């Protein structure tokens, strides 16, 4: 079992939770705080070198535009009032996005020249808005009928510009084919699992779902054939006992981060994760990483995988070093530079230029008839450790 030692610890106040980490390798490590600030941290010391006041309320989500971690200089933040985009180099706000329902924004993702924003439930609407990052005034697409509760997680397919994933507290994880103009047609697949804390792509056609109840499963992406061939998911069930944890931080390339919060027994654990198998025998435990408080996010730099950055509800960002050397983990779940057509339908064949957004359907001035959303009898409960968002 490898061991980590603490290199640096920087506190932003015990009542000021550190909720998210995003790398901007050229500028520093970004963290989003519950007081509405984004801080840019020095890679070596973890000290704040820049402050962006993004909101008066918590940073619910934060994403480097385009997922351009090597050279990117734009960062987006989601809060109750708006999604805002800032230039790290100048601190200038270059865009502010709001929606007609004034719904709080709680989730973000950005790839392929696009930014997707998910909202809380407002009335009967919980929406996903997709923007061309060259034109912030009007969304390219609004998906307003596919979720009926908070949209907690959004992920573009890293290799297919036309595929989007969204997860919600309504229990559904939706996969959209953005080549389809009508939302009903664009809703390619619905995974009915549980209230979603996190979801994403493990491989080009494999999807993970992590729930607020600490259940975990892996699902197959359906193709477009007339016969439904979706296999049963690989369902791990409630992982707290089998992974010896109280909660799962998130799923990362090559590892799963878990935590414990019992009094005087708090810890962060890194479980090796490869080929959809979790190695519980060789987990790396950092005792009392953030005291007994919840760890919200971790980050391991691709070129310095002996280093680990963590942030949590104790208000701290901490830097750790693995004394036994770099971890053998990939930077991404697969090689994202390979362009793919994961649904394999004929009308999508050909060269896809990821520099040009391919979402054709733009917002219409006219109001189309509303379609019925899929319904669930009961909203899944959420655990307090996931607030604020």
Swiss-Prot record:
Coiled coil: none annotated. It comes from the Eukaryota. The keyword Phosphoprotein applies. Disulfide bonds: none annotated. InterPro entries: WD40/YVTN_repeat-like_dom_sf, WD40_repeat_dom_sf, WD40_rpt, WDR89. Residues 368-389 have a biased composition (Basic residues). The modification Phosphoserine is found at residue 351. Residues 361-389 are annotated as: Disordered. WD repeats lie at residues 11-53, 146-186, 289-330. Keywords: Phosphoprotein, Repeat, WD repeat. GO terms for cellular component: cytosol; nucleus. Present with 3970 molecules/cell in log phase SD medium. This is Uncharacterized WD repeat-containing protein YNL035C.
